[in-house]
Amino acid sequence: VRLPGAASDGTIHLVDLLHGRGFDVTGIFSPEHGFRGTADAGEHVASSVDAATGIPIRSLYDGNTKRPSDEAMRSFDVLVVDMQDVGLRFYTYYITMLRMMDACAESGRSVIVLDRPNPNGHHVDGPVLDMKYKSGVGALPIPVLHGLTMGEIARMAVGEGWAASCDLQVVRCRNYTHDTPYELPVAPSPNLPTQRAVYLYPSVCLFEGTVVSLGRGTDKPFEVYGHPDMTGCL
């Protein structure tokens, strides 16, 4: 499972790196925003083939599929998870990872999580999710701003019994602590193009439960808001 943020040095994507070094990459599972990270939030993305490598891309966000088919699970031995999260309960990448972990537990497949820093990992804030409201934008009883990395979520979910126990290995980030400032070298999704957007997203995004637009699709997402019936400005 990977995205454009899954780059080894900010320029080389993991799939390109593994493929170039002779690893047998049998498939790519793509989450929300698609393999190249260009699809908008909630947009359904069809399965396809990566033009650069010829590797099949199996979409987990096509409107029908939330977990891979049995055939897809039989096509590999080890699942490598490399997705750049931003530390929000409603940011869906960790949910895709948990679903894949459950599928791997059922199929006897190993999971390797290549951990990455959390750009919002220096603090925790917001209410803990009441699990009667569990959904595709909230899957664990954690705060809105949870402060965890993907690897920490994976380990905690297994340890707390929130996810099925699987053969899990987390490759940690060298020299990273939660006090380490971190700015993303690559945008993890179309509407988080800047560090400012990443910082504003946890609080401002909550207003998307209303009819107000928060600037998605502009060059200042989450920095502006508007509605056709609004007059003047603040």
Residue map of PLM features:
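Short internal beta-strands
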Residues: D24-H33, L114
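A short helix->loop->beta-strand "cap" motif at the edges of active sites that frequently abuts
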Residues: F23, E106-S110
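Glycine-rich oxoanion-binding loops at beta->alpha junctions
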Residues: A41, V45-F76, L88
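Internal helical hairpin/lid segments
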Residues: R196-L234
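Conserved anion/nucleotide-ligand pocket segment
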Residues: Y133-V204
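N-terminal phosphate-binding or glycine-rich loops at protein starts, especially the Walker A/P-loop
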Residues: V1-F23
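Glycine/threonine-rich flexible loop motifs
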Residues: D85-M97
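Glycine-rich, charge-decorated loop segments at or immediately adjacent to ligand/cofactor-binding or catalytic sites
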Residues: G37-A41, I112-K134
